[in-house]
Amino acid sequence: MYIRKVHIENFKKFKGAFDLELNSDLNIIVGDNEAGKSTIIEAIFLALTGIFRNRYIRNDLNSYIFNKDVVDEYLTNVNAGHKANLPKVLIELFFDGEDAPPIFRGLHNSESSDSSGVSLAIEFDERFKEEYEVLIRGKEVQSLPIEYYEVKWYGFNWDNATSRLIPLKVALIDSDNGKLPNGSDIYISRIIKDNLDSDDVVKITQAFRGLQDDFSGNQSVKDINDGIKGSSGITNKEIGISVDMSSRNAWESFLMTYLDNIPFTYIGKGEQAIIKTNLALGNKKASNAGVILMEEPENHLSHTKMNELISYIKHHCEDKDKQLIISTHSSFVANKLGLSRLILLNGTNTLRLSELKKDTEAYFESLPGYNTLRLILCKKAILVEGPSDELVVQRAYLDKNGKLPIEDGVDVISAYNLSFLRFLEIADKLKLAACVVTDNDGNVNALKDKYKDYLHSDHIRICYDETVNSSSIEIDDKAYNCNTLEPNLLNANSLDEICKVIGKEFNTNEDLLNYMKGHKTDCALAIFKSKEKINYPQYILDAIQ
């Protein structure tokens, strides 16, 4: 059994409805910061356990789990006297597989399909309708009235759901989880407890009670308590200090994990991440879990340590009938775990490489540099034909804005001419801001025909020189194409200016172009590093707007 689909409405990052189809085995969710990766992981865990950030959601409702835009729209409308529907959070998990249980099968889901699954809804409790009407008729509503909300957790057949009843178990691995007040790690403490059977827990509880007895029986503590009793005039009852044993599981809050006699929280973050992951995948609950969730396993890890961790993950989860859902923005993680399981995320837009044309999918699977992720992880991509174009565009951006494009989240990617359309296919499906900087090669009509599907796009721009340079120049007895980067740079500047920047002397344009043709990258690097500024062709200026 596995999760076939996740449906989310108005939860944190996602405004309105968001659907994500999942693979039955491995899913690698890739997106930039704030893309919604963590929201998906948290939504799945919440719907399966009723727990959000270490607390049961029924006991810790707050307005911040609602999408902020939805809440703001509600407040604007209700305070303007308009009809305002109270926001609602809904998370649905659709189960599938041969062993999908009939227990939660029904039609009460967003698909209205006969499916097995669970829903968790956070919505207005109609029992408070009168109180709510009084509230909105009074003073201005400043925040979502969360005190009138309730949590509903049910199967698609309307039966109430609990984590015990849901047959699909889940383990969440988050290497950046919080700490207990005593400094120990919540996450690793829970993992170790999960590995203890009931007899072990009894033994630890008894040992901890023995520590309390030893503490209370210590002569120094007795003397202190006698002093407190003698100086207190607050009550007739005896006052003293001791170890807190008010809870049957009081020992848990005092649990401190050690590694080679060093407190766990004092070892390196990378080592912590690996130990947490290994313990979590190997503990009893994870062994029985059908779904394993991992948030950004690359955090704090070096290249070598990341290799070790990925190897362990693959070994542990292969052929073990587990569904693994990993969020990451590391190209290394995605590449190692498998491009075919990649899910690209940009807001509410998702894309699998399998949804691309077959030749495009095959192309990206063979890419060693993994520029696919560079495209999705930037605010805007400028696609250029090669390294020399990349250097010149970066310098043009620096001259105009006083900083490199990457500092503004703009990535200049050498896509090479033949792969422009492949990158644009991804940008188009994900609604990514992208710009192509290309030569017209002396045939503007052919270029327009090539990019005809994107010439009127709202988020994709094709930048090129609309004028064909008909200059007749021969180099080595061959006609020279004057509609490329180097001639365009020369046209925007003088012979002397270009010579000064590249540190060479030439008497004719032909000699300069001949040199630049054979030393493209060297000349571009000289332009990039030069203290002198030059002029740039208009199509490059258009690209950096």
Task: Describe each PLM feature range.
Residues 82-86, 110-113, 144, 281-287, ...:
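Conserved catalytic network of the ASCE P-loop NTPase/AAA+ motor domain
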Residues 43-112:
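Conserved P-loop NTP-binding catalytic core
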Residues 1-49, 250-374, 390-391, 400, ...:
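Switch/communication elements of ASCE P-loop NTPase nucleotide-binding domains
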Residues 192-275, 279-291:
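Extended helical coiled-coil dimerization/tether regions that scaffold
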Residues 97-99, 123-128, 157-158, 298, ...:
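Conserved nucleotide-binding/hydrolysis micro-motifs of P-loop NTPases
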Residues 87-91, 113-118, 146-149, 168-170, ...:
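Short glycine-/polar-rich loops that comprise or flank the Walker A/P-loop
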Residues 334, 340-545:
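Acidic, divalent-metal-binding catalytic cores of TOPRIM
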Residues 90, 97-218:
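Electropositive, glycine-dotted interaction segments
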